[in-house]
C-alpha cells in the first residue's frame, strides 16, 4: 500500500483497493480480510519517527481506513455495519491519534508522488466524526484533536492540508454531527499567543482552515450568523 513508485502505488495498488471497496467488488469475506489485515499491520504506526518512504505506508493506510469506515457507515453498502464494535472503535482511536504524531510535511514529492500525510489523515478524521456510530458525546474530542494539530505543526501548510482539515468541521456540520454553536464556542476558546514566528505560522494554518469552513458552509447556504461572526472575529 505504500509502494515507493507512485505509478504502482497510486495507479494500481491503492486504486484497486479503493475501487473494490467503493464499488463493492469485494465479497463480504474479502472485506473482512482487508479489515483484519489493516488492523493487524497497524500501518499508521509504521516507523512513525521516520519521514520519506516510511510515511507512504502511514499516509495511504489512513486513506484505506477512511474507505473502510465510509463503507461501514453507508446504509446502501454491501459492507454496511460489517465492522465489529471492537474493530470500529479501534479505527476511531487510531485515526484520532494519527496526526498527533505524524511529522512528515511533504505534499508532493518528485520522488514519491503525492505523500500528503496530513491531508489523508484529515480524510480519515472526516469519516470518523461523520460515522453514525461515532459517539456524538465525543465530537468535542475531534475538535480538540484539530486544536492540537494546529498547535504542534510548526510549518505553514502549502498543499491544501488546511483545507482538508476544514472538511472535518464543515462535513460534520452538514451531516448534523456537530452544531455550529459548538464550533463557535470552540473558536472563542482557542488561544494562539502570537509571540514568535512559529506562533504566527500555527495561527495562519488555523485561520486558513476556518476560512474554508466559512466558504463551504456559506456556499451551501448553511452558515449560521453565530459561526459567521466567530470566524470573522478570529484574527490577530
Predicted segments with their positions:
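Non-membrane alpha-helical segments in proteins
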Residues: 7-23, 59-68
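Generic structural signal of hydrophobic/aromatic residues within well-ordered alpha-helices
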Residues: 34, 38, 95, 146, ...
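Intrinsically disordered, serine/threonine- and proline-rich low-complexity regions
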Residues: 14-18, 52, 236
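Eukaryotic acidic, Ser/Thr-rich intrinsically disordered low-complexity regions
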Residues: 190-236
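Long, low-complexity, highly charged intrinsically disordered regions
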Residues: 1-10, 14, 25, 29, ...
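Short coil/turn connectors between adjacent alpha-helices in alpha-solenoid helical repeat scaffolds
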Residues: 22-29, 74-83, 216-222
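Eukaryote-skewed repeat-based solenoidal scaffolds used as protein-protein interaction platforms
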Residues: 30, 34-175
Amino acid at each position: 500500500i505504500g509502494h515507493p513508485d507512485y505509478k504502482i502505488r497510486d495507479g494500481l495498488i491503492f486504486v484497486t483497493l479503493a475501487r473494490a471497496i467503493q464499488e463493492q467488488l469485494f465479497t463480504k469475506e474479502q472485506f473482512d480480510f482487508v479489515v483484519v489485515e489493516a488492523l493487524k499491520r497497524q500501518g499508521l504506526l509504521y516507523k512513525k519517527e521516520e519521514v520519506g518512504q516510511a510515511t507512504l505506508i502511514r499516509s495511504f493506510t489512513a486513506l484505506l481506513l477512511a474507505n473502510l469506515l465510509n463503507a461501514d457507515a453507508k446504509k446502501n453498502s454491501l459492507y454496511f455495519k460489517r465492522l465489529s464494535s471492537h474493530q470500529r472503535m479501534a479505527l476511531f482511536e487510531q485515526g484520532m491519534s494519527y496526526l498527533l504524531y505524524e511529522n512528515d510535511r511533504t505534499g508532493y514529492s518528485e520522488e514519491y508522488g503525492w505523500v500528503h500525510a496530513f491531508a489523508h489523515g484529515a480524510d480519515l478524521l472526516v469519516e470518523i466524526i461523520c460515522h453514525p456510530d461515532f459517539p456524538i458525546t465525543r465530537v468535542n474530542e475531534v475538535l480538540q484533536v484539530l486544536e492540537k494539530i494546529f498547535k504542534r505543526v510548526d510549518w505553514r501548510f502549502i498543499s491544501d492540508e488546511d483545507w482538508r482539515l476544514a472538511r472535518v468541521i464543515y462535513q460534520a456540520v452538514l451531516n448534523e454531527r456537530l452544531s455550529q454553536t459548538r464550533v463557535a464556542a470552540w473558536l472563542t476558546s482557542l488561544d494562539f499567543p502570537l509571540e514568535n514566528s512559529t506562533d504566527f505560522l500555527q495561527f495562519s494554518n488555523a485561520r486558513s482552515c476556518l476560512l474554508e469552513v466559512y466558504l463551504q458552509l456559506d456556499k451551501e447556504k448553511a452558515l449560521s450568523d453565530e459561526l459567521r461572526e466567530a470566524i470573522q472575529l478570529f484574527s490577530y
